[in-house]
């Protein structure tokens, strides 16, 4: 999945096509868990997790990332955005290597 995404991002960047990425704070699916948010995916809730998820996403070669779909987390997402720091490749790899999905969600390519 990552290789395909990187190829698509590169193609879009080379051809002046804007890229919008979504589901920035999705950590996995709900499976049989009780939903406590209005999203169809299970979102990160802690500020540190939201910071890392948003900063990782905005450190990619994209143009925009819409806000989250869960109102109760909006303040944390906006806070993370206001403090955005471009992550180095090493910092990005550290985030992706330490993230563990709570529940797989094929629609999010989290399996």
For each feature predicted by the language model, list its residue ranges.
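Beta/alpha (TIM)-barrel catalytic core signal, keyed to glycine-rich beta->alpha loops juxtaposed to Asp/Glu
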Residues: 1-111
């Amino acid at each position: 999945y990552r290789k395909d995404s990187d190829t698509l991002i590169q193609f879009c960047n080379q051809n002046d096509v804007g890229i919008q990425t979504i589901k920035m704070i999705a950590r996995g699916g709900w499976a049989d868990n009780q939903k406590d948010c209005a999203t169809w995916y299970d979102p990160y809730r802690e500020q540190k997790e939201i910071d890392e998820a948003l900063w990782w996403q905005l450190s990619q070669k994209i143009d925009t990332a819409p806000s989250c779909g869960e109102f109760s987390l909006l303040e944390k997402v906006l806070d993370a955005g206001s403090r955005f720091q471009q992550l180095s490749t090493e910092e990005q790899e550290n985030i992706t290597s330490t993230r563990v999905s709570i529940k797989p969600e094929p629609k999010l390519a989290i399996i």
